[in-house]
Regions:
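N-terminal signal peptide c-region/cleavage motif recognized by signal peptidases
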Residues: 7-9
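Start-of-helix register in tetratricopeptide repeats
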Residues: 12, 44, 80, 116, ...
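Hydrophobic face of amphipathic alpha-helices that form TPR/SEL1-like repeat modules
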Residues: 14-21, 33, 37, 46-55, ...
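Terminal, low-structured helical/coil segments at or just beyond the last alpha-helical repeat
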Residues: 17, 151-188
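Glycine-centered coil turns and helix-coil junctions that link the paired helices
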Residues: 19-21, 41, 53-59, 77, ...
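Canonical positions in the second alpha-helix
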Residues: 35-37, 72-73, 108-109, 144-145
Length: 188
């Protein structure tokens, strides 16, 4: 949950004002500007508020408030917010720990290409948290995560491969191709 959406465009909207204030380390000013943008449904502002509350930047650290803002952005399809919700459910931050919900939000972000979410799905499949344990699917998601640029996914996948049969590896490679062909949709 260390990502802030700082993409700025041409106009000086409340979101853009928040970006400028954040870049100048005026965290309270950024919070105020992003609250205005979030009130109009701006998912990037909602995500940023969630991150600020989670980190305690410009406000007291408050995971419940972080969850609230992240949930609003995630409901609009923001992959970073969906991943953040997965982390919160996974660790019980601002919400009761719930591996099934964590899996759900990681999957939504993973299907949009989020490498961290793809990695986390691999972990959940490997450990059987929120989903039935399945080493083939764990290997599949770690492979997809590595292809998306996750730095640890390749190492973890290689370790997992040592405990898999050649048939399991072939099955995983087939799943990887199918997932890539379907643009990551319905890969779980």
């Amino acid at each position: 949950m260390t990502l802030l959406c700082l993409t700025s465009g041409v106009s000086a909207s409340p979101f853009e004002e928040g970006v400028a204030k954040y870049k100048n380390a005026d965290y309270m000013g950024a919070i105020n500007a992003w609250r205005l943008a979030a009130a109009t449904g701006n998912a990037r502002a909602q995500l940023n508020l969630g991150v600020m509350y989670a980190k305690g930047q410009g406000v007291a650290q408050d995971y419940t408030e972080a969850f609230k803002w992240s949930r609003l952005a995630a409901a609009q399809g923001n992959a970073d917010a969906q991943y953040s919700l997965g982390v919160m459910y996974d660790g019980g931050q601002g919400v009761a720990q719930d591996y099934v919900e964590a899996f759900k939000w990681y999957r939504l972000a993973a299907e949009q290409g989020d490498a961290d979410a793809q990695y986390s799905l691999g972990v959940m499949y490997d450990e059987g948290q929120g989903v039935a344990q399945n080493h083939v699917r764990a290997y599949t998601w770690w492979s997809l995560s590595a292809a998306s640029g996750h730095t640890n996914a390749k190492k973890v996948r290689e370790l997992a491969e040592k405990n898999m049969t050649s048939q399991q590896i072939l099955e995983a490679q087939k799943m990887i191709r199918e997932c890539q062909h379907k643009k990551l949709q319905a890969c779980t």
